[in-house]
Amino acid sequence: MADKKIRIGINGFGRIGRLVARVVLQRDDVELVAVNDPFITTEYMTYMFKYDSVHGQWKHHELKVKDDKTLLFGEKPVTVFGIRNPEDIPWGEAGADFVVESTGVFTDKDKAAAHLKGGAKKVVISAPSKDAPMFVVGVNEHEYKSDLDIVSNASCTTNCLAPLAKVINDRFGIVEGLMTTVHSITATQKTVDGPSMKDWRGGRAASFNIIPSSTGAAKAVGKVLPSLNGKLTGMSFRVPTVDVSVVDLTVRLEKAATYDEIKKAIKEESEGKMKGILGYTEDDVVSTDFVGDNRSSIFDAKAGIALSDKFVKLVSWYDNEWGYSSRVVDLIVHMSKA
């Protein structure tokens, strides 16, 4: 007998919300039962889901609006809410056990806990959180305990960096390191120069500029891999591409290793324990080659360099939208088995 599907609700139908929905609808072990977004109508929700400038048109089910409160994916009904206050969303009635909190607004434990009042059993925040435990699938998800009701799936960049850093640290030891992510545009940026009081550079036109920015992704690796706490930090350059980003991790190693030995170690892990999370390529790839890649981190063997046998620069690609959304669902599946 087939196991009961894991029932998922999504709060916030932005880039990650919509792509998590796409991932869920293409899998057999999970089921989308409800979506909440107070800022869009059901009809507009259908349009936003169906057409995607990066990932293309949805071709798996016919999509219809049954009524204001119901979408049909093929024959499958999905309940739609338009409720502003998370505690008022009746997840329980809709049958949602897990809620993906992808508004970007309710990222701390207290705010995300509001979903539990409406009947959700667990909440996964699709962003870093200052106080919810963070999990990176392939790195520390085994530390999840079933009494944790609110967790964070960390950031897309932490999901790219952590598997790579784990392999390097396990095999060779990391003394210290700096990360740079060359990162595609995201929704918080501006199409033309505009006001951005908290981040002045971030208010400059996204499609015209390389914009230096801060990121907590490298420090967050220290939360999911405590042995690296205080050893990594990093920054970001926002560049005018719409999806796919790349991490440059420059580290000092404890144990001397040739670049070939490092490549071999990463390749082994990518075919072993980390298969499906960490990838490995020796092809002459560029960013668009990774659109739709569901792995968290794809090591580019040809792009990295070594200065000496203890000082190396490693390069790893990630589809910051699709890879990350895939991990959100993987984390939920893992939690449901705990």
Swiss-Prot record:
| Catalytic residues (UniProt) | C156 (nucleophile)
GO cellular component entries: chloroplast; cytosol; extracellular region; mitochondrion; nucleolus; nucleus; peroxisome; plant-type cell wall
Result, substituting K121A: In GAPCmut; compromised heat-induced nuclear accumulation leading to impaired ability to enhance heat tolerance
Q: Where is this site: Activates thiol group during catalysis?
A: H183
Q: How does a null allele present?
A: The double mutant gapc1 gapc2 has an impaired ability to enhance heat tolerance of seedlings and to promote the expression of heat-inducible genes.
Enzyme Commission number, as recorded: 1.2.1.12
Give the record's keywords alphabetically: Cytoplasm, DNA-binding, Glutathionylation, Glycolysis, NAD, Nucleus, Oxidoreductase, S-nitrosylation
Question: Where are the annotated coiled coils located?
Answer: none
- Tell me the residue numbers annotated for binding NAD(+): R15, I16, D37, R84, N320
Query: Do you know which InterPro entries this protein is assigned to?
Result: GlycerAld/Erythrose_P_DH (IPR020831), GlycerAld_3-P_DH_AS (IPR020830), GlycerAld_3-P_DH_cat (IPR020829), GlycerAld_3-P_DH_NAD(P)-bd (IPR020828), Glyceraldehyde-3-P_DH_1 (IPR006424), NAD(P)-bd_dom_sf (IPR036291)
Xref: SUPFAM superfamilies: Glyceraldehyde-3-phosphate dehydrogenase-like, C-terminal domain (SSF55347), NAD(P)-binding Rossmann-fold domains (SSF51735)
Where's it found, cell-wise? Answer: Cytoplasm; Nucleus
What GO molecular functions are on record for this protein?
copper ion binding; DNA binding; glyceraldehyde-3-phosphate dehydrogenase (NAD+) (phosphorylating) activity; NAD binding; NADP binding; salicylic acid binding; zinc ion binding
Where are the disulfide bridges? none
Where D-glyceraldehyde 3-phosphate binds, per the record, is at S155, C156, T157, T186, T215, G216, R238
**Pfam families, alphabetically?**
Gp_dh_C (PF02800), Gp_dh_N (PF00044)
Pathway stated in the Swiss-Prot or TrEMBL entry: Carbohydrate degradation; glycolysis; pyruvate from D-glyceraldehyde 3-phosphate: step 1/5
Report activity regulation. Answer: Inhibition by oxidized glutathione (GSSG), S-nitrosoglutathione (GSNO) and hydrogen peroxide.
An example GO BP is: positive regulation of DNA-templated transcription
Catalysed reaction(s) here are:
D-glyceraldehyde 3-phosphate + phosphate + NAD(+) = (2R)-3-phospho-glyceroyl phosphate + NADH + H(+)
Chain positions found as S-nitrosocysteine? C156, C160
Upon changing K219A, the result is: In GAPCmut'; impaired DPB3-1/NF-YC10 binding, but normal heat-induced nuclear translocation and impaired ability to enhance heat tolerance
Described function = Key enzyme in glycolysis that catalyzes the first step of the pathway by converting D-glyceraldehyde 3-phosphate (G3P) into 3-phospho-D-glyceroyl phosphate. Essential for the maintenance of cellular ATP levels and carbohydrate metabolism. Binds DNA in vitro. Together with DNA polymerase II subunit B3-1 (DPB3-1) and GAPC1, enhances heat tolerance and promotes the expression of heat-inducible genes.
Q: Which family does it belong to?
A: Belongs to the glyceraldehyde-3-phosphate dehydrogenase family.
Subunit structure and binding partners: Homotetramer. Interacts with PLDDELTA. Binds to DPB3-1/NF-YC10 in response to heat-stress; this interaction promotes DPB3-1/NF-YC10 DNA-binding ability to its target promoter.
Protein name, UniProt field: Glyceraldehyde-3-phosphate dehydrogenase GAPC2, cytosolic
Per the UniProt entry, what species is this protein from, by scientific name? Answer: Arabidopsis thaliana
